[in-house]
Amino acid sequence: MRTDDLIDALAADAGRGTEPAPPRRLALVAGLGGVAALLLVLGWLQARPDLGQAILGPMFWVKAIYTGLLGLAGYLAVERLSRPGGSGRRGWIIGAVVFGACAVAGIYQAITSPDVQAALKLLHGYSWRSCSPRILVLGLPMLALGLWALRGMAPTRPGLAGFAMGLFSGGVVATLYGLHCPEHTFTFLALWYSLGVLALGLIGGWAGRWLLRW
C-alpha cells in the first residue's frame, strides 16, 4: 500500500470515530503539565512578593492572555496534527497574529521611549537572562508528556506535530511563569517570553521527528 493510500485510510477511520480522543488526551497533558509547572514555580522560583497587587494591574493579565493565546494556538495546531493528514493551519494563523500584535506593540513601546537607555531597560527588564531558560525548564515535563501522548495518536507530520506540542506546552507554562515574573512591558514579553515558547517548539519538533515516526 502506498503512503498516501495509508494516510487516506487512517483519515477515514479517524473520521468514523465518535470519541474525542485527541482533545481529551491533550487536556490531560495540559492538566498534568500545568500542575508540574505550577509546583516548580511555587517551590523553585516562588511567586512574586507583590502578586496580590500585581493581579490588580492590566499588564499581569495582558501577559497571561498573550501566553494563553500562544498555548491555544499550539493546542489547535497539535489537535489537528495528531490526526492523519492534519495541517494545523488555524493554529498557525492564530499564533502568527498573536505574536505579530505583541511584537508590534513591543517595537512601538521601544521606539517611543525617551532615549536608548530607556528602550534597553524595556528590553532587558530585570530578568532577561533567566526568563527564556526558565520557561524552557518549566515546559519540559509537559512537552515530554505531550510527545508520549502523541505516540498513541496518528500524526503523519511528526516534526510539525512535535513543534506544535512544544508551542502548546510553552504557552501553558509561560502563563504560570507569570506568577513569578515581575516584568511588565510588551518589549520584554514579545522577545523573551516568545523565545522561551519557541525553544520548546524547536525541541518538540526535533524530538517529534524521531519519537513520532511510524
From Swiss-Prot:
Q: Which Pfam families match?
A: NrsF
The protein's location, in the record's own words, is:
Cell inner membrane
GO cellular component term of the entry, any? plasma membrane
Predominantly, its location class is membrane
Q: Which residue windows are transmembrane per the record?
A: 26-46, 54-74, 91-111, 135-155, 159-179, 186-206
Q: Keyword set for this entry?
A: Cell inner membrane, Cell membrane, Membrane, Stress response, Transcription, Transcription regulation, Transmembrane, Transmembrane helix
The answer to keyword Transcription regulation applying to this record is: yes
Q: What induces it?
A: Slightly induced by potassium dichromate (K(2)Cr(2)O(7)). Induction by Cr is partially dependent on sigF. Probably part of the sigF-nrsF operon.
Periplasmic compartment spans: 47-53, 112-134, 180-185
Q: Which residues lie on this side of the membrane: Cytoplasmic?
A: 1-25, 75-90, 156-158, 207-214
Topology relative to the lipid bilayer, per the entry, is:
Multi-pass membrane protein
Annotated function: An anti-sigma factor for extracytoplasmic function (ECF) sigma factor sigma-F (SigF), which responds to chromate and cadmium. Overexpression leads to loss of response to dichromate. ECF sigma factors are held in an inactive form by a cognate anti-sigma factor.
NCBIfam families per record = AntiSigF_NrsF
Q: What family does the entry list?
A: Belongs to the NrsF anti-sigma-F factor family.
According to UniProt, the name of this protein is: Anti-sigma-F factor NrsF
Source organism: Caulobacter vibrioides (strain NA1000 / CB15N)
